[in-house]
């Protein structure tokens, strides 16, 4: 009888496929993964603790530094939590600008996912196309906020700036190009036999498991569960827009990949409606210069690019949060990586890890 020996290999913390400082120890029986031990914490900066020694307004830039690829949603979730605590009513124009900015940020985040997963699987062309189109999105975000990634654009009570002159015209010019790019990216990979063979049926997740794991966002919808906070529990002015919730059937790597393509189309649809419907008016509510919420606590969730993002804030009546906790979707997503990997092949590890879409700044808050 042939004797075999299990071996352990170390992936990361410096490895191109981990997209940041993440380490995982894989135990192999031949080419089959029999155990996996994720090791996180390399990028921990103590943002929740730092918030306790910052004013409510000073916390805003820290929210950018969690999921820095989809930072606008993190700005939005935080300021909406404080607005809920203080009972602030945000002007309509500011809400429309928030939606436009947040959806642009979502598109940019999904483009990074599409590019990274393609490159991880060996498709260099599949990396180039999304980054080409992401550049159009970043140009619009830079025009609006002055920054390409970490924006600090939201304010408690509104937004930092109004839409600049020429923004609406440029957005209307670029959005059809972004849709054309999505069609190209789909055509490049959706009919590629190698790509399909390496993603379809790989690491499927049932609806029951996804819900038990606390998954949200695209990863949950890939399993066939039609739930999107923007539609099911609308916040801001999302209830004004017509858009669909794309869902998958098998919850496998292919569904998780394809749904992000589909989501870009829906985000473009939302932005186009917002540009047509945006009213005139102020961009900031009348709020005190020094933010001092009443004693109390609040929890608020938004639909971030990587899943459901939640802020829990406790106020003791002072100018600084007594406690802040962030429910970070990347941390939730990565928690089930071990179960996804066991029984799969070593060659599929990178594909599976890429498909759940994590960013390490969001894992290690």
Swiss-Prot record:
<comment type="function">
    <text>NDH-1 shuttles electrons from NADH, via FMN and iron-sulfur (Fe-S) centers, to quinones in the respiratory chain. The immediate electron acceptor for the enzyme in this species is believed to be a menaquinone. Couples the redox reaction to proton translocation (for every two electrons transferred, four hydrogen ions are translocated across the cytoplasmic membrane), and thus conserves the redox energy in a proton gradient.</text>
</comment>
<dbReference type="GO" id="GO:0051287">
    <property type="term" value="F:NAD binding"/>
</dbReference>
<dbReference type="GO" id="GO:0005886">
    <property type="term" value="C:plasma membrane"/>
</dbReference>
<dbReference type="InterPro" id="IPR014029">
    <property type="entry name" value="NADH_UbQ_OxRdtase_49kDa_CS"/>
</dbReference>
<comment type="similarity">
    <text>Belongs to the complex I 49 kDa subunit family.</text>
</comment>
<keyword id="KW-0813">Transport</keyword>
<keyword id="KW-0472">Membrane</keyword>
<dbReference type="GO" id="GO:0048038">
    <property type="term" value="F:quinone binding"/>
</dbReference>
<dbReference type="InterPro" id="IPR029014">
    <property type="entry name" value="NiFe-Hase_large"/>
</dbReference>
<comment type="subunit">
    <text>NDH-1 is composed of 14 different subunits. Subunits NuoB, C, D, E, F, and G constitute the peripheral sector of the complex.</text>
</comment>
<keyword id="KW-1003">Cell membrane</keyword>
<dbReference type="InterPro" id="IPR001135">
    <property type="entry name" value="NADH_Q_OxRdtase_suD"/>
</dbReference>
<keyword id="KW-0520">NAD</keyword>
<keyword id="KW-0874">Quinone</keyword>
<dbReference type="GO" id="GO:0050136">
    <property type="term" value="F:NADH:ubiquinone reductase (non-electrogenic) activity"/>
</dbReference>
<dbReference type="InterPro" id="IPR022885">
    <property type="entry name" value="NDH1_su_D/H"/>
</dbReference>
<protein>
    <recommendedName>
        <fullName>NADH-quinone oxidoreductase subunit D</fullName>
        <ecNumber>7.1.1.-</ecNumber>
    </recommendedName>
</protein>
<keyword id="KW-1278">Translocase</keyword>
<dbReference type="Pfam" id="PF00346">
    <property type="entry name" value="Complex1_49kDa"/>
</dbReference>
């Amino acid at each position: 009888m042939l004797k075999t020996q299990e071996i352990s290999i170390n992936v990361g913390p410096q490895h191109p496929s981990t997209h940041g400082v993440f380490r995982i120890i894989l135990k192999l029986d031949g080419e089959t993964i029999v155990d996996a031990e994720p090791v996180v914490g390399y990028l921990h900066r103590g943002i929740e603790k730092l918030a306790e020694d910052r004013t409510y307004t000073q916390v805003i830039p820290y929210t950018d530094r969690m999921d820095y690829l989809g930072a606008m949603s993190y700005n939005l979730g935080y300021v909406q939590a404080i607005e809920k605590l203080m009972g602030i009513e945000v002007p309509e124009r500011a809400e429309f600008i928030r939606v436009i900015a947040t959806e642009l940020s979502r598109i940019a985040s999904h483009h990074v996912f599409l590019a990274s997963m393609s490159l991880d699987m060996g498709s260099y062309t599949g990396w180039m196309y999304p980054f080409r189109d992401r550049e159009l999105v970043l140009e619009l975000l830079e025009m609006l906020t002055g920054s390409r990634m970490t924006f600090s654009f939201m304010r408690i009570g509104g937004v930092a700036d109004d839409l600049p002159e020429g923004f609406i015209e440029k957005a209307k010019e670029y959005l059809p190009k972004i849709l054309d790019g999505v069609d190209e990216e789909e055509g490049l990979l959706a009919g590629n036999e190698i790509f399909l063979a390496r993603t379809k049926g790989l690491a499927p997740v049932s609806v029951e498991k996804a819900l038990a794991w606390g998954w949200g966002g695209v990863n949950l919808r890939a399993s066939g569960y039609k739930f999107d906070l923007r539609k099911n529990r609308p916040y801001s002015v999302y209830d004004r827009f017509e858009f669909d919730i794309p869902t998958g059937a098998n919850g496998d790597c292919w569904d998780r990949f394809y749904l992000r393509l589909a989501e870009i189309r829906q985000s473009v649809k939302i932005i186009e409606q917002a540009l047509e419907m945006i009213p005139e008016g102020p961009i900031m509510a009348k709020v005190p210069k020094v933010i001092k919420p009443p004693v109390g606590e609040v929890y608020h969730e938004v639909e971030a690019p990587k899943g459901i993002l939640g802020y829990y804030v406790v106020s003791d009546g002072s100018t600084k949060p007594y406690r802040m906790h962030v429910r970070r979707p990347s941390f939730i997503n990565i928690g089930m990586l071990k179960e996804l990997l066991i029984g799969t092949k070593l060659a599929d590890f990178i594909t599976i890890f890429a498909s759940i879409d994590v960013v390490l700044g969001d894992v290690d808050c």
